[in-house]
């Protein structure tokens, strides 16, 4: 998708800024719940800039406009921004951060405005300090100025029905989860927890929604104290079944009343803290470090709130046995769907010489997935990309603006699905013709990195920050790299990107250790701008090692962490490894076996044997896919 002309939108925004005495206006990507993926009505940064990627921040002054984003989107942003915009490439040497660029525009006492519901309290404090150093000031502007520019064309806020998430898949009742949360609050000596993250609320109450595309969440807030559980949600979203399920254990309140109630809580906390009684109960309320500035202000700010990494996000990241079993099961079905798709695609392109574009292909994949048990929908917009498009890390094919798939070029498919028993995210890179030696080398180096993560054994307490280099080492030896993280947490029929764990150089990945029950993607890659892109992605579980005589034992892809027993136990620490769950073959044609060690070849062969054993039963009456799968899982 090419650029749109943003001149009129920027002109109108600047008029509104001038009326409110705002010199610089910040437009974050997130919604008021700090969601990574947002409803269409919250796409303010996309509306004002024309950039459609999921991450970034727009800043508009009276004479300039800038868009900051990360390495996943550099190519896309360069294509989508018109000549009104400057692209700030996050992480590039000598390139200012968006905060630094904003502060530069505020020199000389200028005012920077931002909607306080769209920025976290900690980010607001840090931005304010950066701006002050340049002589400017930060102002929370309650009325969103981009919404005023958008006007009647802004989409309505969705209000989809909420559904129960059955205990057979959740593995734990909402009453147990709330009880566990209250124990955490007691440990921290806090009066309660004000919850704003949508996936945390969905997980806590074992409910799922459909307010944000691809993410089974719903707009709500919650407040949990030692004696009450309040859910702030528009009641028309709740069927009778859900109301009966929540019963008298949860009080339902209007979504719009959260800030009014937060102010009351803040005033009450302040009044109690001003008293003289030595036995007064704890006064502070917990909020997540991801909670909005406006929510913190409503509670009375730092004197009444303690910002912490949410105890719910930590609990949610460690899947219980029902959730882990669901992830295993849905990845087998999803792997079967992908094999059927790749077999179909090869037959259409190579044997039938069918002309297919990238969207035609991704539509077929969704159709195939939808036949499988517990399918609900996609977990993100499928990246179906041929040739040079595969070098755009988060490429999005548009129905009226996409490429014909070239069987003589690399084809990259990054896709996932939501099933009642789990969430999938798999990338496979294929070639239907004769790949070049460079393509095979790049693919094999990426594969070696994936294997290195998958076979890693490490002591308890190791972070994803520390493991990230395992995946990059073979590319680094060739002077190559990729501009995205190596992996992210994956939800259980929830958001496909889930914190707080992951593999990468983000600061947050150095703060939280990998733990048994985590589900993480393993997705190294290599991209040659304008030529091709290679990515292999497979989620896995960390696990506890049991009697491993040596370190390189094959376990694969989305990966699950679990504890394992090693021959030795230095420092009496538990040791962890990974269990793979993705069941989709690698592309044999792109592997250069001469670049693999004997151990790595065994890993590939064992992985492919497991895929055949677990998924071939789906193709007893499908000769095309069965033959394709048989060929692709042969030993190398």
UniProtKB/Swiss-Prot annotation:
SUPFAM superfamilies documented for this protein: Creatinase/aminopeptidase, Creatinase/prolidase N-terminal domain
GO cellular component labels: cytoplasm
Keyword Hydrolase: yes
InterPro entries referenced in this protein's UniProt entry, alphabetically: Creatin/AminoP/Spt16_N, Creatinase/aminopeptidase-like, Creatinase_N, Pept_M24, Pept_M24B, Peptidase_M24_C, Peptidase_M24B_aminopep-P_CS, X-Pro_aminopeptidase_P
Keyword Metal-binding applies: yes
Disulfide-linked positions: none
Gene3D superfamilies in the record: Creatinase/methionine aminopeptidase superfamily, Creatinase/prolidase N-terminal domain
Binding site for Mn(2+) 2: 414, 425, 537
One Gene Ontology biological process: proteolysis
Highest taxon of source: Eukaryota
One function term, GO molecular function aspect: metal ion binding
PANTHER family: XAA-PRO AMINOPEPTIDASE 1 (PTHR43763:SF6)
Stated role: Catalyzes the removal of a penultimate prolyl residue from the N-termini of peptides.
Family affiliation: Belongs to the peptidase M24B family.
Protein name: Probable Xaa-Pro aminopeptidase P
Organism of this sequence: Ajellomyces capsulatus (strain H143)
